[in-house]
Every structure is written in C-alpha cells, then in structure tokens.
From Swiss-Prot:
GO MF annotation terms: S-adenosylmethionine:tRNA ribosyltransferase-isomerase activity
Record-given protein name: S-adenosylmethionine:tRNA ribosyltransferase-isomerase
Gene name of this polypeptide: queA
Organism: Streptococcus agalactiae serotype III (strain NEM316)
Domain of life assignment: Bacteria
Catalytic activity: 7-aminomethyl-7-carbaguanosine(34) in tRNA + S-adenosyl-L-methionine = epoxyqueuosine(34) in tRNA + adenine + L-methionine + 2 H(+)
Amino acid sequence: MNTNDFDFYLPEELIAQTPLEKRDASKLLVIDHKNKTMTDSHFDHILDELKPGDALVMNNTRVLPARLYGEKPDTHGHIELLLLKNTEGDQWEVLAKPAKRLRVGTKVSFGDGRLIATVTKELEHGGRIVEFSYDGIFLEVLESLGEMPLPPYIHEKLEDRDRYQTVYAKENGSAAAPTAGLHFTKELLEKIETKGVKLVYLTLHVGLGTFRPVSVDNLDEHEMHSEFYQLSKEAADTLNAVKESGGRIVAVGTTSIRTLETIGSKFNGELKADSGWTNIFIKPGYQFKVVDAFSTNFHLPKSTLVMLVSAFAGRDFVLEAYNHAVEERYRFFSFGDAMFVK
C-alpha cells in the first residue's frame, strides 16, 4: 500500500486557525461504514450516537507549555527548545533550534536564569538531551516561562492556552493535544453520563511525531514514533464489563484508539492494567480488537491518522467522506470539526 493512496485535495483556507467560541459548536460528520451513509450534524448531537451501556474512552493527558525561548549566556545567541519527553529526573529529550550551536556542556538560560538547560547528549535531527536546573517546582517554572507548542500549520497566536487543553486534562506530559477531545464541555459529558454511558479515562502522552509526515512511499517501511501510555485496572475492568454486557467501546480520538488496540493486541482482545511505550501503526488490513466506534478530527492528507481511520471504515469510503467535508466547508485539523465513525 502506497502513501499516495491516502492523498486528497484540501484548500488551505479550511485549516482552522483558531478554536470556535463554544467547544461543542463544531460540526460533526457521522459516517456509518457498514451502511455507507454519512450525515451532517453538530458535535453536541454526539449524545444521539451514544447508547446506554456504552463506554466513552478519553485521553486525559495534559499538554505542557513545552516551547521555551532562551539564550546562551556567553554569546546571547537565541535558542529555542521544544520539550519532547522526560527521560529521567530533570533530564529531557528536546528539539533544539538552531541545534548546531548546542554541543555537550553548552548552557542555555531562560527567564533571566530562572531555568538553565545544560546539554548532556547530542541526538540526530536536532535532538538533544538536556538537564534542567531551577529553584522550586519544575512544572511551575515551565508554566510561567513556556509557550504552548501549537502545530506547525497553526499560524495565529492562541489567546487562551486552555483552549488547547481538553476540559478533563489531568496527566502532564504531552507535546500536542489529543484534539478529538477538545470538543467536549463539562456539561456535555454530564449529559452523556446521565444517559447511562460510562466515562473512562486512559493516558497517552502525545509526541511531536503526530505531526511528522510519512517520508516513505511504501507503508510497510514506515516506522511510527513511540509514545507513553497507561491504563488503570479500574478502567480496564470497567471496559471489560461493558464489552461482556454488550455495550460498545467508543474511543475519543486516535490516541485513545492506539492505546486500547496496543493493550488489546497484547492480551488477545482483553484489557488489563498496563503501561509502556507504543509505536503501533494501524493501517488498512489491521483487525480491530477493542474499539467499536470513535470520534476524531479531520486529519492531514497522507497522514498515519487518515490511514488509521481508513483501517476501520475503508479507504474509499473515508476519502469519499473527506471530499464531502471539503465540499461542505468543514474545518480541518486541531481546532477544526469532528467526525463520528461507526
């Protein structure tokens, strides 16, 4: 299967630059892959798609303000660091710009010395391992000095950084938001729960690889980035009980899908408490073991996320739905509209 098989025409003006005033005011395209139907709706009508006895599974990761702007104390040269993942203690893997100025031992100062990064190791493609020194609590220092790492296709400044977090964000660690969850309000979640749907949370810390284009033609040669995930025993038990009683596992977003399918693949379709790193690549031909339906945003042409949706609903039907979304002027990507796939 070829990367170009997942290409489609997307006018640049359909890439949403800012979030809508109300989270759940976005449009929702409901696609039923068995009956090959699609219905234009609004996101708050997702309530109609959920049935009593279902479980709605959400990723409660929280985006760190992971973009830091600082300078080298000796030369005052400007340096940008993007935090990717905490390797141990105060050591982080980062993406540095310009990386060539940062050799092992080089220091970078942020916020007039409130935070100092010392390079301990050089990696490829501009990556570095740095060790931070600071007074107080690291996350509090980061909250005051860092900026939200918005995706490369968003050029507008974000006025309210909370709009790039889900309302249920809890576990610090992501370099990008699990954007399918941005549409939910607390009020909508209450209505869903009142309907008899179980709300279940897992964690997958979204890495920057989520924006990395596929650089090979043959999909079998593509290697996915690794991301940390965690599912508690309580969540696993709830989901297994829902399955056993005939309810559906409805995932919110591709990160929830990848976590559930990673664990389901390890334990023959059953869910157990588990944590680790996953680089699962879900593409057409993959047999889903856990997820019965899901919501997701509209993704980039030729991306692994379009491939994942195609694995569930069929490539031709998914591309037909995407072309419909373009014709109907749906908004795309992180701050865009959503689809519900069943």
